[in-house]
Each structure stands twice: as C-alpha cells, then as structure tokens.
Amino acid sequence: LDNEKIIWAFVPILIMVGLIFTQPNLSMVLLLLATSVAIYICAGGSIQLILYGMCTMIPLLLLKGLKGYQSSRITTWLHPEADPLGAGYNIIQSLVAFASGGLYGVGYGSSKQKLAWLPEAHTDFIYAVIGEEHGFIGCLLIICLFWTILQRGFLIAVKCQDMYGKLLALGLTFSICFQGFLNMWVASSFVPATGVPMPFISYGGWFFFFFFFFVL
C-alpha cells in the first residue's frame, strides 16, 4: 500500500477519534481505532507501522489523555476489593453472578443479582446475568455464537470479488464481534469497564436494530 495514501486515509478517522475523545467517550474511540486498524491490516497494511503508532500513542494516552474517572476505572479493575461498596461494587457483583451460576445456572429468569445488586444488568453486565441464569454452558454458547458470526463474516469477505466489499464485510464483522467479546471481557474482569453493550443481546431499541442492519 502507498504510505501517502494510508496517511490521508487515516486523517478523517483521526479527526473523528479526536472529536469523540473530547466528549469524552474512550470506549467508542477504542472501537473505532480497533476497527480501522483491523481493516488496514486486512487490506495489506504494515503491521510494523501500526506497532510504531501504538508505541507512540499509548504512553501519551496514559500520561496525558486519561481523565480522572478513566484512571479510576483502571485502578478499580486491578483492585476492586479496595472499595467493594463503591468503585469496585459493579465488578464484584458481576463475579458473584458468575459464581452463583456454576456449570448449568440457576434457571432462566431466576437471577437474583439482576434484581437489586448488579447495576446495568440489562446492558453492560448482561453477560454476567447469562452466566448466573445459564451457567458456564450458557456463557460458552454465547462465545460460540459470536465466533460463528466472526467465522461467517470472514468467509463472506474471502469470497467477495471486489476489495470494497471485502473490507466492508471485514469491518462490519470485526465491529460486531469486537464489541461482543469486549462486553464479555468487562463482565469477567479481564479488562477495565468500558460501557460497551453486547450486540443483539443487551437492551436498546436503535442499538438492537443497528446491528441487525449490519448483519443484513
């Protein structure tokens, strides 16, 4: 790929990222950048160039770009037990939901955590509710469903004859699956809280139809 064309292609993306970052909405910034990088790499772009950019941007973001509450999210993620009734409450209750579910779960609609203890049970922590009601088996099924979407989307991209269609299929597939897996990682305490809901499953009118439009 022509490096000059690459730079110009990333200019509008970086402008959008900058505007979103000032809101601030770091989770949407992460999603937009991750999807753009995935499309760039699949188009034959240089992974080395991406690594250089990450080595430059990540330290700057950590040192200067994070707001107080965003830094607090990282600290809470590392040590939720330090403030179990405050900042660490959400993630602790999420893990309690998973533990309560065990292998097979407590049954559909029988979650106790979602009734009073687990905040945002219908959006950010819907995966924890699934874990409590349907257990490890239910969680594994959700992973398999998103993995199937990922596999089928990439297969469509491979079979596509033109580059635009190929990259469009890759971008939409990556965007859906990245959000899905990111939601799972947050609920499981593998990454700090991001506020990203799970496609097709989390509550939300336009959000729900938006992703079905992606699939169509």
Residue ranges of model-derived segments:
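Re-entrant/interfacial helical elements at transmembrane boundaries that shape
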Residues: L31-L32, S110-K114, L145, S188-P197
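P-loop potassium selectivity filter motif centered on the GYG triad
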Residues: L1, A99-G107, P199, F207
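A juxtamembrane structural motif centered on a specific transmembrane helix
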Residues: F181-L216
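TM-adjacent membrane-interface loops and short helices in multi-pass inner/ER membrane proteins
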Residues: T76, P80-T123, Y127, H134-G138
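Residue-level recognition of specific faces of alpha-helices
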Residues: A97, K114-W117, F146, I156, ...
